[in-house]
Structure formats: structure tokens, C-alpha cells
Amino acid sequence: MTSSELREVSVRALLARRRRLAAGLSEPERTLRGVLLWEGRRCSSEGCRCRRGELHGPYSYLAVYADRRSRTIYVPQTVQAACGAHVEVTQRNEALLLEISQINLELLRRRALE
């Protein structure tokens, strides 16, 4: 819901929506913040096809932002699916937390925050 839509909803309805959203949070132990991406790479061999533009790969990496730095971490093919599932869980939970935060902000505006 947008902030303008939240302003039109009763406090009781906001509290009920917040409870429903909080109940939808799942598997916090599977939290993995980042973006799964695929990149091709060049090797160090002089006569290799990658020197002509045919890169090796694609290989999967997890791009994370931590300690004010962006980093990419290689994700082996054996854990690619699990890594992707963890990232999806995190994205779903973050979307729910964002909406819960917006509801709490609206409740604060109305002086109804518990």
C-alpha cells in the first residue's frame, strides 16, 4: 500500500494488516542479502578463445554490499539453487518489513503506535 492509501485506513485495519504481514515473515535463518548474477570471465592463456570475446562461463556470483563496499562472491554450481532460494526469501521478507515499517510510520503519525 502507498502512504496515501494507508492514511485512508482505520487504525484497527492497520494493526490487523501489520499482524498479517508479520505472520508472513518466513525463515529468518535463511536470510542472505545480495543479488545473484552471472558473468563471463577471461583467463590468462594467450591463445584462448576468451581473448577473441568468447568468455568462459557464465559463472554465478553473489553481489553484496557490506562495510560500505560492494563485493562479489563466487557461488559454486552445487549451491547455486540454495543461494538463489535464500536470496528470494530475503527479498520477500524485506518487502514485508518495508510495508510493516510504513504501517508503523502511519501509526506514529496518528499517535497510535503500540
Explain the meaning of each model-derived region:
Residues 1-114:
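A positively charged, amphipathic N-terminal helix/segment that binds anionic biomolecules
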